Amino acid sequence: MTGAAACLAGFEGITVVIHGSSGCYYYPATLLHAPLHGTFILENEVIFGSGDRLREVIGDLSNKGNRIAVVTTCVPSVLGEDIKSLFGENDVIIVDSPGFVGEMETGYHKALSALSPVTDPGRLGINIDGVSLSDPFYEGNIQEISRILRNAMIPIGTIFCRDTSENIGHASPLTVGTNEDFKSGVGEYIGGTLGIPALRETCKKLAARYTYANMDPVFNEIDKQEERIIHACDKFLRRYDPPGVAIFAGAAYALFAADSLKRYLDAQILIVGTRNDPPVLPNMDYRVEKLTGLEEVRDTITALEPDLVIGSSFERSLSSGRAFLGIIPPLRGQFRLAYPPLVGVGGTLHFIENVLNACIDKRA
């Protein structure tokens, strides 16, 4: 449900209604910081049906000029209410996305499918996908990849999912990604931008596809900034041993963190615990498995005794004073005003910088 709301609320011109209880509304509302609406159904509506309440809420919103999207939660789904029949031919987007259908990524993709994106062969530029309002780095990721593309003189197409609703219907034929857990499936996928190696390969493909692009400044920046990363990590390793690291995140961010720390810091990757199903990759250098329960995570941290834990506030609460770095929600107990990226050149710089400082702070 939260993933579906994150997808839909990312598009200007779509009004999102969470059809469920107050609890179903408040979690995405506080996580996404987006203008969501709720039906706040009560006990009698669970028994006698919630259609009247939904019609009332949508009636109040229908004169605002936006398309309305309804995300159904567990109670309406379990009751089997026929939500679509309530609106007939009206242009209401219905996304059945109760919590039991899967992870956040499942709801996101269900909502994106309901929007029916269309590519426009005549549109120049390239789409940016993998953007979710649930991601604490989404704003910085957009800014970083937009900056790189503009430096290469490549126009930007549709941003999935942080754009206007009109742009859903005429996306560019080509796409680059920021977070493959939220891959859009729109157009031809050129490659990802998580980590320096992936960014470099994607830029090579962009240079081949966009003959008018000026990629030299981009490649020069990649090489220069990677040297800075190598120098900083070498300086750290002259004073400290490589850290043992336990990583808990979505598969894309978790594997980025593991690959970057192994490449630049020679870190011992003790575990890569993913919240969603990890991709099947050959020749993995470390243990990768899906871990979705706090008890599993607690037992893993206790058994492996890592120097550094990477994850969310949940993992921080289990880290017992170890060095910690947050890369996935929720990230509680801190102010977040700036828009740091995790993708592109700036994302790797930001990530490695924070890892080094977290480790030094705990060893000082």
For each of these PLM feature ranges, what is it?
Residues M1-A364:
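An N-terminal assembly and electron-transfer interface module characteristic of large anaerobic redox
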